[in-house]
Regions:
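Acidic (Asp/Glu-rich) sequence patches and key acidic residues
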Residues: 1-111
Length: 111
């Protein structure tokens, strides 16, 4: 079963930021984007997906967004969905945390 996470931040998660953050956390991987950049995926050397990142979206209803995650931060402007495919979530979680750190955000579990 996939692990569904959310990256909450005030800075947009872009392909450039993902690639820079992943270079340290997942140096042997490759970043691939789909649908004009709306979906990004980090894959391992065998092209197996490790982490999928969807385009950041502005938070229109902060209270509702905060209620959808475990232990939300006090404020955030952007919501970025992150999925780790089935299997060991450890590598994907580490990369997600590195991306969050690169944009000054946090990774949270969905409720």
């Amino acid at each position: 079963m996939a692990t569904e996470l959310v990256l909450l931040s005030d800075v947009e998660v872009t392909a450039d930021r993902i690639v820079r953050a992943a270079a340290d956390a997942h140096p042997e991987g490759t970043y691939v984007s789909y649908r004009g950049g709306d979906i990004g995926q980090l894959v391992d050397v065998d092209a197996n997906p490790v982490l999928t990142i969807f385009a950041s979206r502005p938070v229109a209803h902060p209270r509702e967004a905060a209620a959808a995650v475990v232990d939300p931060p006090a404020s955030f402007a952007l919501w970025t969905e992150v999925n780790i495919p089935s299997g060991d979530p450890t590598p994907g979680r580490g990369i997600a945390e590195a991306i969050a750190a690169a944009v000054g955000g946090v990774i949270k579990e969905r409720v």
